[in-house]
Amino acid sequence: MKRRRRWRGWLLFLALCFCLLCEAVETNATTVTSTTAAAATTNTTVATTGTTTTSPNVTSTTSNTVTTPTTVSSVSNLTSSATSILISTSTVSGTRNTRNNNTTTIGTNATSPSSSVSILTTVTPAATSTTSNNGDVTSDYTPTFDLENITTTRAPTRPPAQDLCSHNLSIILYEEESQSSVDIAVDEEEPELEDDDEYDELWFPLYFEAECNLNYTLQYVNHSCDYSVRQSSVSFPPWRDIDSVTFVPRNLSNCSAHGLAVIVAGNQTWYVNPFSLAHLLDAIYNVLGIEDLSANFWRQLAPYRHTLIVPQT
């Protein structure tokens, strides 16, 4: 009987210990793992023995690409344009062929003869207005032409006449003060003259400076001459300056052969055909390349005695 009681006591004791052990295990040995995934948040629960720790680990990565639109407004470039004429200064070299297939020599420097010649050209156009339909003037401008030096090569042959419609030259003509009148022989054939004195009787002594002045307008070309005083370097004291030259009609735009050049020097007046005067000027251009303006000058002019210069008193 005593052994059975002992065994019962031990069994009860073991059962009590077993129950206590089970409770301890249920209380202290619990592992909880919880993972919650959100769109931008992750909660991680770390399992520890006897302790439950919840550590929120928030990881939010946002990649924002902001595109700012660039607005380019259309800009109208307003260019204010005015009617204008572009004039350039140039130097033209060479020879000019005419209808007779001869080479024309233009201009020279009387004080310094050379094998090439030049003309100093000054062009001053008139003011021009642009008128609208209602008659209002919309723009006024006066274009200016610069100086232009034209250089050509002297021709070995006889040059043709220079048309005053293309070359209106300001010349200086002189007459001998001892002469009351001037007689110019008009003859198509070249006479055989014995000496240089006879040339002096036939030819009117003259000196000139070439300066071209052309007045351009929209309708026509206005020819005018400006006459300068004798240069101090020219040693021709017995000669007298020309007083005035007038072209009739004033505008030779149609290049009519009926025009006249009225030359006044002192108390004498000459009525010169502009075309004939052009022939004479060509002759002067051609011979001023010689070294001295002596008797050879008149001899060289002899082929051009058909030039009509009629003195009037």
UniProtKB/Swiss-Prot annotation:
UniProt entry keywords in alphabetical sequence: Glycoprotein, Signal
Q: Where is the signal peptide?
A: 1-24
Cystine pairs: none
Q: Name the domain of life.
A: Viruses
Instruction: Give the residue ranges for region: Disordered.
Output: 47-73, 90-117
User: Is Signal among this UniProt entry's keywords?
Assistant: yes
Provide the glycosylation site positions: N28, N43, N57, N77, N101, N102, N109, N149, N168, N215, N222, N251, N254, N267
Q: Does the keyword NAD apply?
A: no
Q: Where does this protein have compositionally biased stretches of type Low complexity?
A: 90-114
Describe the family membership recorded for this protein in Swiss-Prot or TrEMBL: Belongs to the HHV-5 US34A protein family.
UniProt protein name: Uncharacterized protein UL116
Taxonomy, top ranks, is: Viruses, Duplodnaviria, Heunggongvirae, Peploviricota, Herviviricetes
Gene that this sequence comes from: UL116
